[in-house]
A protein has these predicted regions:
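Zymogen propeptides/activation segments of proteases
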Residues: 26-114, 379-380, 408-429, 434-438
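Beta/coil-rich, acidic/histidine-enriched accessory regions frequently appended to metallopeptidases
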Residues: 282-460
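Active-site microenvironments that recognize anionic phosphate/pyrophosphate groups
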Residues: 22
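Juxtacatalytic substrate-recognition/specificity segment
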Residues: 64-209, 216, 227-229, 241, ...
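Bacterial N-terminal signal peptides
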Residues: 9-19
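N-terminal secretory signal peptides that target proteins for export/translocation
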Residues: 1-5
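Acidic/His/Gly-enriched intrinsically disordered linker/tail segments
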Residues: 154-163, 186-190, 205-270, 276-322
């Protein structure tokens, strides 16, 4: 779901991972489910997104693999102008035809070029068999659109299915008055790319964590419409939420698209699709860290924690070095603190899958050495990152040490005078859990607020 960052609240939960299931799951299921949504043509819808009048006479309009639904009166009606009506005589508004063209382009990239699996068929729901239904609705400022699974997909007495079919609901005009600072066509394009990605995700595993669902959907926006760069507004917020874990189901998950960008730069674009295709077969079910871990290992990489430590190191100077495809457009990541010049240790408390960037002052000497101690058993990393030259055209030199079981770590950079900036990166890369919390809709991670001690000194 694409949410307007100016209006945060309950809508930030990913509708893509809401179940088409009763409000309370069977004992033993790891998920807590909310009341399922209904198509606008079905009544009533708990979110109050039902149409208040019948569909327009020519609705739905279908082309290729999509059907677009609309009404002809009331607040939910799109602009009904049909300037080419004399030519085609179809009675379909130009806006609806524009949505169908956008849909065809999105499908050509996501399913064609990138090779993602076709959506799960919804049968005859909404119109023609097997087509993805798109409903135009007055959504307003709270959200740009959403994808939702259909109700009634739970066979009686059986466990919850992991592969589901669903539908899209998009705004009926993306008026600049309601979405200030954006452009209507661009909003339609990136929202369709994002929400349709959720539909595809549902046919891999509808119950992966929201952070994976949203971050990969934002990543998909930029694959389909690279020139719009709408995702950068999420990145600008992401850099300030350094205490929020990468795996958190929170507003930060949209900006976590940078994790996917980093993986793609390292392993190629197929790794994102591969993480989804492996999701159904990883354990515990629905644990997205395991899905990424499986794809990374299959691509020749190391474990998730090691890769996260490398990612954290590379974020320190992501505007340099070319490790992020559009890194020069990213904001500089704020340093959270400075290490004392006299070598006194600094104490930090880090949540799982978080890191802190610390300024290191080393104007001279043969080398600079950083030391850190992580709690025993906690996967952790320590890096020194030095930038030579300016932040957009400079060169980066780094040293990283990853300890899967915690303990003492030491890294060293030679000739510190050559660097414009030196940063120590302290990483809590641990992802161990103890079950799933039905109340919080998140895993019970075991290593939050883990104490670290770090220091740095120059070698004369």
């Amino acid at each position: 779901m694409r949410a307007n960052l100016r209006l945060v609240g309950p809508l930030l939960a990913s509708i893509a991972v809401l179940a088409a299931a009763p409000a309370v799951a069977r004992a033993g299921d790891q998920w807590a489910f909310r009341q399922p949504l209904a198509r606008p043509t079905d009544h009533p819808d708990p979110a109050r997104h039902s149409y208040t009048v019948p569909e327009a006479p020519h609705s739905p309009a279908c082309s290729g693999r999509f059907c677009v639904h609309w009404v002809a009166e009331g607040l939910d009606a799109p602009d009904l102008a049909d300037e080419n009506g004399v030519e085609d005589g179809d009675g379909v508004p130009d806006y609806v035809e524009r949505v169908l063209k956008v849909a065809a382009h999105v499908h050509a990239i996501e399913n064609g070029k990138l090779g993602w699996r076709e959506p799960r068929s919804d049968g005859h729901r909404g119109g023609l068999e097997g087509k993805t239904d798109v409903y135009l609705k007055e959504l307003g400022q709270q959200l740009f659109g959403y994808a939702a699974p259909d109700r009634g997909q739970i066979p009686k007495g059986l466990r919850l299915p992991r592969r589901l079919h669903g539908y899209l609901v998009l705004d009926n005009d993306y008026s600049p008055f309601q979405y200030p600072g954006t452009k209507p066509l661009a909003d339609l394009e990136v929202t369709f790319a994002h929400e349709y990605c959720h539909i595809l995700q549902m046919n891999y595993d509808a119950y992966q964590d929201a952070w994976m669902a949203e971050s990969t959907a934002v990543w998909m926006e930029d694959q389909v419409y690279n020139g719009i760069n709408d995702y950068l507004r999420y990145v600008r917020r992401w850099v300030h939420l350094y205490n929020t874990p990468l795996t958190a189901n929170s507003i930060r998950e949209y900006g976590t698209t940078v994790w996917n960008e980093w993986l793609v730069r390292r392993y190629g674009r197929d790794i994102i699709r591969d993480a989804w295709s492996r999701a159904l077969h990883t354990r515990p079910g629905g644990f997205s860290v395991a899905s990424y871990d499986s794809a990374i290992r299959a691509a020749g990489g190391s474990e998730f924690g090691d890769e996260f430590a490398r990612f954290a190191r590379d974020v320190a100077e992501w505007r340099s070095g070319g490790l992020f495809r559009e890194g020069r457009r990213y904001p500089d990541v704020p340093r959270q603190n400075s290490l004392p010049r006299d070598g006194e240790p600094l104490r930090l408390w880090l949540n799982h899958t978080t890191f802190q960037l610390l300024r290191v002052h080393a104007p001279g000497g043969r080398a600079v050495i950083a030391r850190a101690v992580a709690p025993r058993g906690v996967a952790a990393g320590l890096a020194l990152v030095g930038r030579i030259g300016d932040e957009r055209r400079g060169r980066v030199v780094s040293r990283l040490l990853f300890r899967p079981h915690g303990g003492a770590m030491t890294v060293r950079l030679a000739q510190p005078r050559r660097f414009e900036r030196i940063t120590a990166v302290v990483v809590n890369a641990d992802t161990r859990t103890e079950g799933f919390s039905a109340r919080r809709l998140d895993w019970n991670y075991l290593t939050d607020i883990a104490p670290f001690r770090v220091e740095a000194r120059a070698v004369r």
